[in-house]
Amino acid sequence: MARVKRGVTTHARHKKVLKLAKGYRGRSSKCYRIALERVEKALRYAYRDRRNRKRDFRGLWIQRINAGARLHGLTYSKFMHGLKRAGIEVDRKVLSDIAAREPESFKALVEQAQKALAA
């Protein structure tokens, strides 16, 4: 039976890792063993940060909504509670966009929330 030589698969694997390491500094983009460590760590960071990005954006949206609501005399939590009581179901992403780009529309939403809280 013929001996199995794995030069082709090894070369392909090395090429794949070095391609992923393109742009890294120094030997991190030239040497397979070093590149492999850097690529694995980069992939771990990418996996972790895809999840963290969702948290970060939600926090950013909440900060923007809070800033917009406080301009009109409401805190974030009271504003959101007022919207819920008024039956207005708009998600935080859209609310933050409205607060940043359309202050007049956001003011109308704040007034609706205040009415619902007063009732």
Swiss-Prot record:
The keyword Ribonucleoprotein applies. One of its GO terms (biological process) is ribosomal large subunit assembly. Keywords: Ribonucleoprotein, Ribosomal protein, RNA-binding, rRNA-binding. Pfam families: Ribosomal_L20. GO terms for cellular component: ribonucleoprotein complex; ribosome. CDD domains: Ribosomal_L20. GO terms for molecular function: rRNA binding; structural constituent of ribosome. The keyword Cell division does not apply. It comes from the Bacteria. Belongs to the bacterial ribosomal protein bL20 family. Binds directly to 23S ribosomal RNA and is necessary for the in vitro assembly process of the 50S ribosomal subunit. It is not involved in the protein synthesizing functions of that subunit. This is Large ribosomal subunit protein bL20. The gene is rplT.
